[in-house]
Amino acid sequence: MELPNYSRQLLQQLYTLCKEQQFCDCTISIGTIYFRAHKLVLAAASLLFKTLLDNTDTISIDASVVSPEEFALLLEMMYTGKLPVGKHNFSKIISLADSLQMFDVAVSCKNLLTSLVNCSVQGQVVRDVSAPSSETFRKEPEKPQVEILSSEGAGEPHSSPELAATPGGPVKAETEEAAHSVSQEMSVNSPTAQESQRNAETPAETPTTAEACSPSPAVQTFSEAKKTSTEPGCERKHYQLNFLLENEGVFSDALMVTQDVLKKLEMCSEIKGPQKEMIVKCFEGEGGHSAFQRILGKVREESLDVQTVVSLLRLYQYSNPAVKTALLDRKPEDVDTVQPKGSTEEGKTLSVLLLEHKEDLIQCVTQLRPIMESLETAKEEFLTGTEKRVILNCCEGRTPKETIENLLHRMTEEKTLTAEGLVKLLQAVKTTFPNLGLLLEKLQKSATLPSTTVQPSPDDYGTELLRRYHENLSEIFTDNQILLKMISHMTSLAPGEREVMEKLVKRDSGSGGFNSLISAVLEKQTLSATAIWQLLLVVQETKTCPLDLLMEEIRREPGADAFFRAVTTPEHATLETILRHNQLILEAIQQKIEYKLFTSEEEHLAETVKEILSIPSETASPEASLRAVLSRAMEKSVPAIEICHLLCSVHKSFPGLQPVMQELAYIGVLTKEDGEKETWKVSNKFHLEANNKEDEKAAKEDSQPGEQNDQGETGSLPGQQEKEASASPDPAKKSFICKACDKSFHFYCRLKVHMKRCRVAKSKQVQCKECSETKDSKKELDKHQLEAHGAGGEPDAPKKKKKRLPVTCDLCGREFAHASGMQYHKLTEHFDEKPFSCEECGAKFAANSTLKNHLRLHTGDRPFMCKHCLMTFTQASALAYHTKKKHSEGKMYACQYCDAVFAQSIELSRHVRTHTGDKPYVCRDCGKGFRQANGLSIHLHTFHNIEDPYDCKKCRMSFPTLQDHRKHIHEVHSKEYHPCPTCGKIFSAPSMLERHVVTHVGGKPFSCGICNKAYQQLSGLWYHNRTHHPDVFAAQNHRSSKFSSLQCSSCDKTFPNTIEHKKHIKAEHADMKFHECDQCKELFPTPALLQVHVKCQHSGSQPFRCLYCAATFRFPGALQHHVTTEHFKQSETTFPCELCGELFTSQAQLDSHLESEHPKVMSTETQAAASQMAQVIQTPEPVAPTEQVITLEETQLAGSQVFVTLPDSQASQASSELVAVTVEDLLDGTVTLICGEAK
């Protein structure tokens, strides 16, 4: 029992469940959109999904690869096998299916597309013919007969006159040609038809009689074409007309809009003169199908060329896909040649026949002497000079078999020899080889068309291509700004060409900049065609415009591959030409060496060139020879331009090189000297391209980051190597010239790179400055100086950098390569400090560089550009990742289990989990594990409705709420984490928690190690260091301080650092005394600072002791934090010593401490204060010395306190009073401060 279409019904039910998100066991995320589906369906449709879903339930796809809308289409196709109704980019869907390894979907779509395109031209077409109208009879009364020819081999007879159609009825024509051509009714009982049927070898079903009716033009044309002479031209015209008739519906639909046709026709430069006027007349009446019928009538009358109509249709091939398909299906063998049935040789080109009979030619030609003699004795018009040179090069030093193979290769691949020229040569020597004459006669009878002619020069060929594809290219290039951007990125353009192109594009204010460039090539001839094609290749490479389809079609043109090779790799074309003449060049070089006409440098280069061109005769093919020459030239570091310079020098004394020079000039490498007919030089354009290529390659090899300082290796340059160029092409730029070989460069860095490789500089002898001994090279001189004098030849060479030791975070022990990295780590991980904020959106950042990266999101600035593909990025890290990922630059991370390579180590870690099965991210609710955190997030979002999960960094578990997360840390990781009891914030170190808790009790945990100033926030301490200790702050942070000024306390002058400050003190204030540390000799302006320094740095212990317990601390800020958190409540008041930071519970204890511990300091500071300003509190009468400290109520000390000294002008200054005053007393008027100048 078989259930019909049960599989389709099952898939439909699965698709219904998928849309309802029932029984779905996997999730596909694209950006923020999630698709639920069934693993089995995805795995069956895609090999990629099958591999990924084997180990996971969640797949994340980048939205740049496939958009959610496109993936929805693909998903529907997987379940239903149908593409939903609507507008879709079908080729994009095929490409996406291919990239996702949905090969069945991609192949099915491609097959469907192919069948849709070919359905109109495949199989036998059967048409119903209808009776002609009376108008037709009136128009063509002079054509009374109908002529019908049956196709040969159309089938055996199976009809009789009784089966013929009645007058006026439709007739089915079963022959293929008739089916494509006949469009009018043929009446029965025609004697002519009966005669044709009797004479045909295989008669078809035709009418037997015909009344006096006129045939259609199609019938007449078809009849004439089938029964006329066997000339190839007539048969070719018939087949070209047949092509137009086959696609009549497609072409007439494309030409439906008359105004559009006339506009395109006006722009088309390929259709000119009478042909253009003829087409315009055809569109004067009714357009559309009627206009195309009028065009077909003109073609039948031979007043309009078929190729002109095809050129008109080509203008629509990119706006009308049906026209493009029809033109692409127009095969050359069906259009240009006619091969009758029963023949295997006739109809093939002469070049194809020569290739097919290569073995016969090798057997016929047994010696080369007759060929050489015929070339020497032949008349000048026998063959062209180029063809003679090609034949001579193929014959020199080779066997007859190798010569025939090379001649055929020159004819088919390089297009430097025509088939007709080769046949002429063989005809001239056929008397010497008897069998050769019979073979040539047979081939010439079979051949129908001449083969391709000699390839024109690259510029001429490029001009012809531009003329042919001008309109298509103009439709693509409509943005002048893109053109200007691409022109600026072209490196192989000469400066003059670049300026001309930019000027032409900028002159056109609209979108016709490309038309201006084409006009400069085709009409004004102020620009070379190769420059335009170089621009097009750059545009295609950068994917700036949709140029791929058109370039693919252009590359199918005959000779296009050789042209584009010459445009993109002129050096290969140059070496290929030199290789063809290698024997002649070697002879010329050897002759000049024997006559000793070379300089020492030229002789060295000549020997190298001889070695490069000495290819053994047993080399398999010309391609292998070229590869060998390229390999040797690269190995010897001899570019093609140096060989060309050598040939220009050799040619002056060896005129026999003239054919080589002409051929090199033919491809644009050489040009004649001004005013000299037979003197050659390397063209400026080729010179520029060679320089750019060499410099880019050298700079790429030498550009290792961090290995050179800013000044570079100037020691390798003998003296100052640059000077102004007198004839620089751009007066605004300098030209740096090598003193050894006079080669000029626009950039100094390129000159430095060149100097390392300059052969002339290396060949010159250099003298040792120490002992006047001469050496052949700089390298030998360096070796001599090192051995004889114990010093290197480059005294200014940069010293090797010391290895930088890593720095360690004192809170968590993590190591960093640089101190700046550790500082950023502390700010973000430990202190949660973000001092830099965005003015646009208020976002805060820990580093200024991070803020700058963020600001580019608002400004849209993308300053980092990829040198390979010109993509731009907002961050340098994004560019670095891109160059690693897309262009394989820099360190890559390889998988030890497979061949996969990744740009970042984290990517490798994620990938390795696919091999090991490790799933470190575990869902707390259901226990499901995931290899990536993203997979866990999607799982929580999809299955548990948890928007933002909280992950534990210790055990990778996830929690839905912050409370659950904190509870987990208290229970499981209490020893590892330290939560704040007040706010619940968690810290990874006890010291971090202590500093944080102070913020709740009003303490100041961040204290200055120099002056003991304490702050509640780290940012306050930073600001204090910047303003009060700028030199120390700059030294600690390895960068110049923002507030780099140190003020003199005596004269208010400011200084950038302590050294300058000390110099100033010694010079201007010599009487001022500094306090020096006995152990480290450091100077301090006040004794209090010295005392704090000794306690903190040299005591070796923790000098600050708690008064209430046995705890000791190294810094006063830590003591203050301890006292405020352990011994006092937040409302209680402490009395800190401003000099040493010690804390006291009462003012009396503080005063006692000041008298016992800091009497000298108090005395010194009292004198300094009295010399500048008197600060007094007026009292009714002096008090006894034992009552100098005024004690106030504790309620009055609840606020901040100010300590004031009271100098006694009448008594000794040592008996000055110390008064503690609260801010409340100053505000409510209880105490009044009277300040005045000291007398």
Swiss-Prot record:
- Residues annotated with Phosphoserine modification: S190, S703
Q: Where is the composition biased (Polar residues)?
A: 181-199, 705-719
Q: Where is this region: Disordered?
A: 130-231, 687-732, 779-801
Where do the BTB domain residues begin and end?
24-87
**Zn finger limits (C2H2-type):** 807-830, 836-858, 864-887, 893-915, 921-944, 950-973, 978-1000, 1006-1029, 1046-1069, 1075-1098, 1104-1127, 1135-1158
Keyword annotations for this protein?
Answer: DNA-binding, Isopeptide bond, Metal-binding, Nucleus, Phosphoprotein, Repeat, Transcription, Transcription regulation, Ubl conjugation, Zinc, Zinc-finger
Cross-link Glycyl lysine isopeptide (Lys-Gly) (interchain with G-Cter in SUMO2) position reads K1066
- Species: Homo sapiens
Q: Which SUPFAM superfamilies match?
A: beta-beta-alpha zinc fingers, POZ domain
> Which ranges are annotated Low complexity under compositional bias?
200-212
Q: Where is the composition biased (Basic and acidic residues)?
A: 136-145, 687-703
Q: Which domain of life is it from?
A: Eukaryota
InterPro entries in the record, alphabetically?
BTB/POZ_dom, SKP1/BTB/POZ_sf, ZBTB40_BTB_POZ_dom, Znf_C2H2_sf, Znf_C2H2_type
Gene3D superfamilies recorded = Classic Zinc Finger, Potassium Channel Kv1.1, Chain A
| GO MF entry, a single one | DNA binding
Q: Where in the cell is it found?
A: Nucleus
What name appears for this protein in its UniProt entry?
Answer: Zinc finger and BTB domain-containing protein 40
Any one GO CC term of this protein is: nucleus
Q: What does this protein do?
A: May be involved in transcriptional regulation.
Pfam name, any one: zf-C2H2
Sorted alphabetically, the Gene Ontology BP terms of this entry are:
bone mineralization; DNA damage response; regulation of transcription by RNA polymerase II
Which family is annotated? Belongs to the krueppel C2H2-type zinc-finger protein family.
